[in-house]
């Protein structure tokens, strides 16, 4: 009898389809598992994440990362908001979130993993072979050094709303979309956001509030579009 890795079994049993209306293929499931193993191994020597238990890793890292691109996990999402997604950037990727799960889920996207800490960039480079990903491009540097060449920008846990807009919106081509991954979100946040958007020739597309599937924590994803 072949014994299976219990962590892999747990990952398979989480409610992907019920909560994302999307199910990873066996290859993607294996890539998530290899990413988990690589992250745990590297985490012993550097501070990549405090979230290591399997249920927490699935919900707070994998699920949360993919929830931000939920519109593009559906068959109808390819032309959503008039955006054809090919070039993606994860700003402040850290241990690879949300960029690596996104790259696994969407192998047809080219995902730049932008990180300001060289040690973390080295880890991100190692994931290409460790996880079997040919569509991730780790880069060391800051957002300000990148031009307007991206169709989709993702920014998670990087400062306040003003800083997120300043980092993300200038990187987008006309029609490109910025996804802000946020915890709590208030009417005051929306009002503040509306004062920021004109300077970037951008508009608010949607604000989606939801609860996480295991811990039932409140989360929001904010979708903004560059218009000029």
UniProtKB/Swiss-Prot annotation:
The keyword Aminoacyl-tRNA synthetase does not apply. GO terms for cellular component: cytosol. SUPFAM superfamilies: S-adenosyl-L-methionine-dependent methyltransferases. GO terms for molecular function: rRNA (guanine-N7-)-methyltransferase activity. S-adenosyl-L-methionine binds at residues 92, 97, 115-117, 143-144, 156. It is found in: Cytoplasm. Disulfide bonds: none annotated. Keywords: Cytoplasm, Methyltransferase, rRNA processing, S-adenosyl-L-methionine, Transferase. Its EC number is 2.1.1.-. The keyword Transmembrane does not apply. It is an enzyme of class 2 (transferase). It holds the Pfam family GidB. NCBIfam families: rsmG_gidB (TIGR00138). Belongs to the methyltransferase superfamily. RNA methyltransferase RsmG family. Specifically methylates the N7 position of a guanine in 16S rRNA. This is Ribosomal RNA small subunit methyltransferase G. It comes from Thermosynechococcus vestitus (strain NIES-2133 / IAM M-273 / BP-1). The lineage of its organism: Bacteria, Bacillati, Cyanobacteriota, Cyanophyceae, Acaryochloridales.
């Amino acid at each position: 009898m072949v014994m299976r890795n219990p962590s892999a079994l747990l990952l398979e049993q989480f409610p992907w389809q019920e909560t994302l209306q999307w199910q990873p293929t066996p290859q993607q499931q294996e890539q998530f598992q290899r990413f988990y193993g690589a992250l745990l191994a590297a985490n012993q020597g550097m501070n990549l994440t405090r979230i290591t238990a399997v249920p927490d890793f699935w919900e707070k890292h994998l699920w949360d990362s993919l929830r931000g691109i939920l519109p593009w996990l559906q068959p109808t999402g390819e032309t959503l908001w008039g955006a054809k997604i090919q070039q993606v950037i994860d700003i402040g990727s850290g241990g690879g979130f949300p960029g690596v799960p996104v790259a696994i889920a969407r192998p047809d996207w080219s995902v730049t993993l932008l990180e300001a800490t060289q040690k973390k960039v080295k880890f991100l480079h190692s994931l290409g072979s460790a996880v079997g990903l040919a569509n991730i491009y780790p880069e060391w540097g800051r957002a300000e050094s990148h031009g307007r060449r991206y169709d989709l920008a993702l920014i998670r846990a990087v400062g306040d709303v003003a800083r997120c807009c300043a980092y993300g919106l200038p990187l987008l081509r006309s029609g490109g979309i910025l996804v802000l991954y946020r915890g709590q979100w208030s009417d005051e946040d929306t009002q503040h956001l509306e004062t920021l958007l004109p300077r970037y020739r951008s508009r608010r597309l949607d604000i989606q509030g939801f609860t996480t599937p295991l811990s039932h924590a409140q989360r929001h994803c904010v979708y903004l579009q560059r218009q000029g």
